[in-house]
Amino acid sequence: FTLALSAIDMAMWDIKGKALNQSVCSLLGGHRDRVVTYASGALMRPFNLEFMADMAPKLVEMGFRQMTTQMGAEPTAEREVARIRTVREAVGPDIDVMCDINQLWDVNQSIEIGKRVEEYHLYWLEDLVVRVDYQGLARIADALTTPVAAGEYVYGIRPFRHMLEHRSVDIVMIDLLRVGGITQFHKVAGMAEAYNIPVVSHLIPEIQVHNIAAIPNGLTVEYMPWTIRLFEETPAIENGEIVVPDKPGLGLQFSQDAIKQYQVS
């Protein structure tokens, strides 16, 4: 249900912006004209250490100052830690490195391995345990010095209330499709702000840049390039930041090739 609601909601915001000749970011408050973005998808779980050691510096050369990798599939804790060590040694101490576990660990694993990677000063550890284990997440967040992020698997807005009330996270991550669209995104962002907790985005950077740039507690935008080919033009990446489109609405135009590819006759 929330996926369909999100599509309608995003379309309505786009229409409103075009009718008023303003960008969606401007309609939402227009806090900034660009925000930091982190490279995602290039250091994923199937890739071996040699590939990661080679790819991570290339992301820095592309201008990214933040990047995310993954843990959660290795047979031993030592091999999990090796993934983080490899990326950190490849990029040095001045680049922000995050890590996504995709809900694959339990609480004890999260604390054990989380403590072992603290020396690598991760920017955050993401989605360590199943999303509804608010008390478990709170235990992890309390035990680790590394910030704990979660929220991408949450549908709707009510679960975020439980997450915040249990002090389960240090950073709230919002998936625009699962939460219910732009309108619901900003309800969650407001809740997080009341707890003095920053917000980051999950996927769809072309649209999420409007959301993160418009809120005072917006921290960074995930730059996953999966949806770039759907549009004629996408927001520019400059020096590790994503630029907010200044065109009316979302500032996006679907590619004719994409329309032909996905058209249902």
Put a short name on every predicted segment:
Residues 20, 77-78, 101-104, 123-128, ...:
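Short acidic/polar alpha-helix capping motifs at helix-coil junctions
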Residues 1-97, 102-104, 108-111, 115-119, ...:
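N-terminal capping/lid subdomain adjacent to the active-site entrance of alpha/beta enzymes
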Residues 38-40, 68-70, 98-102, 126-128, ...:
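A cross-family glycoside hydrolase active-site/sugar-binding cleft signature
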Residues 26-29, 49, 74-87, 106-109, ...:
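Active-site-adjacent beta->alpha loops and helix N-cap segments on the catalytic face
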Residues 65-73, 120-126, 168, 172-176:
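Active-site groove signature of glycoside hydrolases
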Residues 115, 121, 132-241:
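Shared catalytic-loop signature of beta/alpha-barrel
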